[in-house]
Amino acid sequence: MKTNTDLFEKTPVPKAVATMAVPTMISMLVVVIYNMADTFFIGQTKDPLQVAAVSLATPVFMIFMALGHLFGIGGSSAISRALGERHKDRACHISSFCCYGSLGLGVIVAILSVLGMETILHLIGASVNTIGFARQYLAIIAIGAPFIMFSTAFANILRGEGASRESMVGNLIGTVVNIILDPIMILVLGWGGTGAALATIIGNIAACLYYIAYYLRGKSTLSIHFRDFKMGDGIASGVAGIGIPASLNNILMSFANIILNQALVGYGDTPVAAMGVAMKSNMLVVLLQIGLCVGIQPLVGYNYGARNKKRLMSVFKFTGLVSVIMGTILTLIMIVARKTMIQMFINDAEVVQYGIQMVVALQLSAPLLGILFLCINTIQGMGKALPSLILTICRQGLIFIPLIFVLNAMFGLDGVIYAQPAADYLSIVVAILICTHLFRTMDHREEKAEG
């Protein structure tokens, strides 16, 4: 079976980064379109309450994806390091564990979500005006949790063995199916939020079928056969060690969005709808930078496993330069096109007015935001569970959420709007400090190995 050792070990760094990151960035662009589709077509109903309801429910969907990242990012990091250490059998055990782990957890989460639906609706801040729409959307999303988690996990698992293109194809299939079904179910059939949720789940099922077919055709170095399932020998703990911080990062992000929405609800449903649209628009900037940095994680993991610090640092520095250049260009595009971006989703005058201010606020940290994601993915690629966990808790738990309360109390609605960029800059400083420390300890690790 062909592996990607030449790509990981010998290909010039710019080409290796492009080979791994470009398909991942395209996948993230697909995710942007995927996430924008529901809001866009719901917006065509001309009903701000439905837009607000989907915005309120989105963090729950993101939590399901975050739980998929537990196995996806954790598994990808463990697989790339195992391949770097020439332990192919271990990599197969890891992929099989992630397959059945993501499906099993998905079933459990689906059952708990359906049973606790009213509690969830209360926690996300649904008002009397939006709770009905939010309930319709979440009921379908909850049932589809196993498919969301499996497709999220395996989009990352494929990258762990260097199959970024195949990961991209799976994402693309899911998005195309979603975009085709959205206008039919939302507008033609008039199903509103229920139709948006159904289209999303069917798209995830299509992606799952592609990933399963890819493995069953023998195209992969890895395995999803139950005979290769193994939890012992540090496999479950190795996946969880990186997967839990990665998952926790996304869960805290979703929880922070819930807190943000609850703060905005105090100023009416219109700011909630506007922030939902602004954040959807800003996904273009955020997810492309995440795509670049997620794409290089297997390169980091492989070369860390192979003790090749020189190549690891070359990958890190080159990716950092690209992220700043790309972030600056994307920021300028967003500022110039801010009104058009908001009006793409909804043309309500009050929502557009709030939305423009929110888009500009979110761009304040965008040029350097890629550095944060680069540090996070480098730490995860190196398999450093504790530093990854510390950075995760700092970014969302200890910085952003408290800032929402503090700035809301000090500056009102403007404080809530500008909490995100303020938190981003503080998080970037923390991330750089942690990464610098890890690179220094890597020098000591190599000295001990040579001794």
Residue ranges: model-predicted function:
Residues M1-A21, I79-P146, V188-I244, V300-S365, ...:
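Short alpha-helical transmembrane segments in multi-pass integral membrane proteins
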Residues V30, Y34, F64-G68, I108, ...:
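Residue-level hotspots within pore-lining transmembrane alpha-helices
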Residues K10, P14-I33, A37, V60-L67, ...:
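Residue-level signal for short hydrophobic patches within transmembrane helices
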Residues V51-I111, I148-S167, A274-L332, V336-R338, ...:
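Small-residue-rich hydrophobic transmembrane alpha-helices
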Residues I141-R159, S167-T175, A196-L209, I290-C293, ...:
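Short runs within selected transmembrane alpha-helices of multi-pass transporters and secretion channels
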Residues L29, I33-V51, L121-V128, I184-W191, ...:
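Helix-terminus/linker motif at the lipid-water interface of multi-pass membrane proteins
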Residues M36-F40, I111, T119, A153-I157, ...:
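Alpha-helical transmembrane segments of multipass membrane proteins
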Residues T19-D38, I140, G174, G203-A207, ...:
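Transmembrane helical elements of multi-pass membrane transporters/channels
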